[in-house]
């Protein structure tokens, strides 16, 4: 069946029907479509389009359709144009002629906006719950090694020593922002579009506020033309998905490196790795590589809808049907990646000796030395030059920080008094970084406790 056709002398061609149909993918909206139509039936009763008996008959039929739609058999042989048409056809089969009234004063333009908004707000909540789990795993792993020291990197070169929990808390902060981003996306989606009609507003005095309350929306949209041409709420959701995937990809990249033989910091669990069909020794970080790979796919989902929307005239255009596949795909890939990340974190263990040795044998203490000189009264630019020459001399002599004695340091530069030798130990320099947000031991312990407390307050 079609929800249109009187103006046409013949039906659509077979090629066009195949090309334009969306049931294969928008069927995921069926539960939202049914709930929205049930609320709309109540609104139609309130304006006298449906009697109480007719409304009850329609709502009961929708309940039956909703239950049956859980089975794949429900869709077998369906050739409907989209999920809305399928639902109306099924309604007619159960409720008869009264089903013809359900679309009174309603357009598929607002209906698909409603369905998508409902789906996105629920999916946003689900993804927040998965982010919550990842953040909890990060804190668990941080608490296992509260005093472990690792080199921090800039430009993929050893830069300064940091505590392992400080590093993990950096990702906690990223994922916390992601958690809030999905909350923002849900809030922006959570306004009712019903009553907007195709673009000019419904011709019936529907109680939009009552429908909003019935469906759990926080309010109603304010402009019917905006509703018809709007997919900002979908872009907001896709942006949240994309940024989260980028954060997951960065974590994956780090851990692919840190678990390699060259680093040897991390041991990934057998359950999240795979082997080689040829090389018996291999233990490959496939889970992390797939997360990294899927991030590009999700970036593409956002890009595709941005490009689709960029040149559309007001208001609705059929191009906007192309929002569903990127939305669904981004949500699926992110959900799978979050579950995988949580499993990876849970299975991973740190070998503290390896990153500690990497920190001790490199010049991650250089900034500590320069800042200590500055605290002792040497202008920082001069201190920077002194330490730079000291590092250069060490490189030429193939000396590690621990190879220097206090006497040799003082002989190299009189500004290096005997107490400076202690700063050649990375742990010593971190004592000066007891600042909120810094990597000092007490600061990190406080940050870890705060993160745990904050996680407990998040509403999922």
Curated annotation (Swiss-Prot):
Keyword Amino-acid biosynthesis appears in the UniProt entry: yes
A biological process from GO: arginine biosynthetic process via ornithine
Matches recorded under InterPro entries: Arg_succ_lyase_C, Argininosuccinate_lyase, Fumarase/histidase_N, Fumarate_lyase_CS, Fumarate_lyase_fam, Fumarate_lyase_N, L-Aspartase-like
Protein's cellular compartments: Cytoplasm
Record keyword Iron-sulfur present: no
Metabolic or biological pathway, per its Swiss-Prot or TrEMBL entry: Amino-acid biosynthesis; L-arginine biosynthesis; L-arginine from L-ornithine and carbamoyl phosphate: step 3/3
Primary enzyme class: lyase
Alphabetized PROSITE patterns for the sequence: FUMARATE_LYASES (PS00163)
Catalytic activity: 2-(N(omega)-L-arginino)succinate = fumarate + L-arginine
Cellular component terms per the entry's GO annotation: cytosol
Keywords: Amino-acid biosynthesis, Arginine biosynthesis, Cytoplasm, Lyase
EC number: 4.3.2.1
GO MF annotations, alphabetized: argininosuccinate lyase activity
Family under the similarity heading: Belongs to the lyase 1 family. Argininosuccinate lyase subfamily.
Protein name as catalogued: Argininosuccinate lyase
Gene: argH
């Amino acid at each position: 069946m079609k929800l249109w056709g009187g103006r046409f002398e013949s039906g659509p061609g077979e090629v066009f029907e195949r090309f334009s149909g969306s049931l294969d993918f928008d069927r995921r909206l069926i539960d939202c479509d049914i709930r929205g139509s049930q609320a709309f039936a109540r609104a139609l009763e309130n304006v006298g389009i449906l009697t109480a008996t007719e409304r009850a008959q329609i709502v009961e039929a929708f309940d039956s359709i909703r239950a049956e739609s859980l089975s794949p058999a429900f869709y077998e042989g369906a050739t409907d144009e989209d999920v809305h048409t399928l639902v109306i056809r099924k309604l007619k089969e159960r409720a008869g002629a009264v089903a013809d009234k359900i679309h009174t004063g309603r357009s598929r333009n607002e209906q698909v906006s409603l369905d998508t908004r409902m789906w996105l707000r629920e999916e946003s909540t689900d993804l927040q719950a998965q982010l919550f789990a990842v953040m909890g795993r990060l804190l668990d792993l941080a608490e296992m090694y509260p005093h472990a020291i690792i080199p921090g990197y800039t430009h993929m070169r050893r830069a300064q020593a940091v505590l392992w929990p400080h590093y993990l808390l950096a990702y906690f902060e990223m994922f916390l922002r992601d958690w809030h981003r999905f909350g923002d996306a849900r809030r922006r989606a959570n306004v009712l579009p019903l009553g907007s009609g195709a673009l000019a507003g419904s011709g019936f005095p529907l109680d939009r506020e009552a429908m909003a309350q019935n469906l759990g929306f926080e309010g109603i949209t304010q402009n019917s033309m905006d509703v018809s041409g709007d997919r900002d709420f979908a872009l907001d959701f896709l942006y949240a998905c994309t940024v989260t995937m980028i954060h997951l990809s960065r974590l994956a990249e780090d851990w692919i490196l840190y678990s390699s033989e060259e680093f040897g910091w991390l041991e990934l669990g057998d359950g999240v790795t795979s082997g080689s069909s040829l090389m018996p020794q291999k233990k490959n970080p496939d889970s992390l590589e797939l997360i990294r790979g899927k991030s590009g796919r999700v970036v593409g989902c956002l890009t595709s809808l941005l490009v689709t929307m960029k040149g559309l005239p007001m208001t609705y255009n059929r191009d906007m049907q192309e929002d569903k596949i990127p939305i669904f795909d981004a949500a699926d890939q992110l959900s799978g990646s979050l579950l995988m990340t949580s499993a990876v974190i849970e299975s991973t263990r740190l070998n503290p000796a390896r990153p500690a040795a990497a920190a001790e044998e490199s010049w991650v203490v250089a900034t500590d030395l320069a800042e200590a000189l500055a605290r002792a009264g040497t202008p920082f630019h001069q201190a920077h030059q002194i330490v730079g020459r000291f590092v250069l001399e060490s490189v030429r002599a193939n000396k590690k920080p621990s190879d220097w004695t206090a006497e040799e340091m003082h002989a190299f530069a009189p500004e290096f008094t005997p107490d400076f030798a202690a700063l050649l130990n990375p742990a010593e320099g971190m004592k000066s970084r007891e600042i909120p947000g810094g990597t000092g031991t007490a600061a990190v312990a406080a940050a870890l406790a705060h993160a745990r407390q904050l996680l407990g307050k998040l509403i999922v």
